[in-house]
Swiss-Prot record:
Localisation: Cytoplasm
EC number(s) from the headed UniProt entry: 2.7.1.2
Reactions this protein catalyses: D-glucose + ATP = D-glucose 6-phosphate + ADP + H(+)
Entry protein name: Glucokinase
Biological source species: Helicobacter pylori (strain ATCC 700392 / 26695) (Campylobacter pylori)
Organism lineage string: Bacteria, Pseudomonadati, Campylobacterota, Epsilonproteobacteria, Campylobacterales
Similarity remark: Belongs to the bacterial glucokinase family.
Amino acid sequence: MPKTETYPRLLADIGGTNARFGLEVAPRQIECIEVLRCEDFESLSDAVRFYLSKCKESLKLHPIYGSFAVATPIMGDFVQMTNNHWTFSIETTRQCLTLKKLLVINDFVAQAYAISAMQENDLAQIGGIKCEINAPKAILGPGTGLGVSTLIQNSDGSLKVLPGEGGHVSFAPFDDLEILVWQYARSKFNHVSAERFLSGSGLVLIYEALSKRKGLEKVAKLSKAELTPQIISECALNGDYPICRLTLDTFCSMLGTLAADVALTLGARGGVYLCGGIIPRFIDYFKTSPFRARFETKGRMGAFLASIPVHVVLKKTPGLDGAGIALENYLLHDKI
């Protein structure tokens, strides 16, 4: 089949809260981007059909190839989302949507592929020096959950992405304050993972824990109705509530610890890349936050980490971009 006949391609980036859809009408050219709330649809197929109906006027040909990046492990045909109610069979969904091929990959596999094609203005560097070209790149990002993956560029230029579930590693507190936060979380959950703190709901959890700290019982606090990640972040940046600023500082410190742990584990001298929608919302603050200092506070490995650049991904739809690149690789090489 001529390459032009494989377009348009149906792309999706499905997280715990939102599902983003787009149509790739030519290489790296994505149109008709829509964001739908997962909770508004009973199933993935329902959401896709609704999306396609909205794009009907601009859809000259029905897509026959699709690539969906989903925020959950892919371990066969049956897929169960980690942070929302959707479950689906890949093959049944393919048939339902009358696709010739439906590729389903982990969302952070897509993020890794997207990073391979990013330009300098798509990224904001936070410290470090320069990436080593063929060294591993660590990709992680807080959102509804916490994703982690690895990108390796081989000497021949080919790419290898290693998916993982590093967001669910056990959280390791760094100091007495983080021990207090961990203890609060431990009273609520059997397993306290990094994702419990490094996510949207994690900001709320950190805030709740800090509000119980001795000496902070009587400080001005948000009402229960105001206790959302967005309001906590806004109040922290505006200086409205000191406890909100402490919450955001603690969040960034914890992220620095985890990013350093991942970088050390992988030897990620190709750089660390922070994806997801949370960090770009306060990028100016993040540049001077405790993140980088904590990232480099690893005793004998401090000098090793000091040279590793950390990049915040600023591009709006990297999940869709990566889903498209993964599908292109599959169609060309029969593998991703």
